[in-house]
Amino acid sequence: MITLDNFESCVPYRILVRGEEYYDTDAVSELEETSPGEWTATVEGTDDYNVEISMNGKEVESWYCDCPYDGEICKHVVAALLAIRDNNKRVSR
């Protein structure tokens, strides 16, 4: 089970580092919880990529990115997950 607390250990190191770079340089924009547990974001890379993430509490149920990467999880999804986790920390304070 992938969660907001453990997803970093479930992602290949190179993808994680690239996702962290995108997150750290504010490449994630338009982060929005469109309905409970349903998140969308735009991540600026070579182009702007649309990311969708479905969650149940802290559990990540599914994700989608319209980038051309054909691996299981891309750097854009990682960046969006970092943004969601950061957003949830700010809201819960």
Describe the function of each predicted region.
Residues 1-93:
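Long, low-complexity, compositionally biased intrinsically disordered regions
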